[in-house]
Amino acid sequence: ERELTLMLVVDVSGSGLFGSRGQSKRELAAEIASVLAFSAIRNNDKVGLILFSDEVEKFIPPRKGRSHVLRVIREVLFFEPKRRGTDLNAALEFLLRVQAHKAVAVVVSDFLGSPAQAKNEARRHVRPQMMLLESLAQASFTRLKQTNRRHDVVAVQITDRYELELPPLGRLVLRDAETGEVVEVHTGDARKREAFATRQAKTLAETARIFRSAGIDAIQLRTDEPYGAALGKFFEAREKRRLRG
């Protein structure tokens, strides 16, 4: 009988609070983590949890059992992080330290940040929350490859529609969920909205390319779209590849 270890590595940074259609990225991440945790318990696998912002906020070592999985799910749903930034490297380094044996490490995050070097370009366009997105996967490429050599890393990237395309709502005053920076944006200009959408699409495509280069299976999900069928097909395809060797 097989016995795997599933490590859920879940981003609880401030950007996860964003959601334009009634569900935040954090809420969707919690749903996905719950689905994966229950699937693991049905397969008699161990489940562990790492919650991270710009530091590791919570660690639950992997164990079996329904009560343990329910504890994991409660933490994902209700944990209140102390910090709002994001540092994927910190989470991956912690995983490498605490998990000696091979695990399936599912990283659930938007994999997007707003580093200082993006600010000037961002002000020439417009931004949701409101910074042009940068790929955290790019900054963590070396650590991702290193982690994937020891473990089987899976990336579940969660985004929101309005991070990718701005609605024509005129003048908006918005606060960056991670930095606290307040900016005023003008969404009435169609050319700026188009330029914004083009750049965001390039960032998502670059993130997907980085995962492929690191040998990591990845799926992109959105808060405004059903995820069940897509997630199921993704893991079914992974299992078929595993069985083929």
Kindly label every feature range from the protein language model.
Residues 31, 35, 86-93, 205, ...:
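Short, contiguous clusters of charged residues that form electrostatic/catalytic patches at enzyme active sites
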Residues 94-103, 115-245:
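Von Willebrand factor type A / integrin I
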Residues 31-38, 74-77, 93-97:
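A broadly conserved amphipathic alpha-helix scaffold signal in soluble, globular proteins
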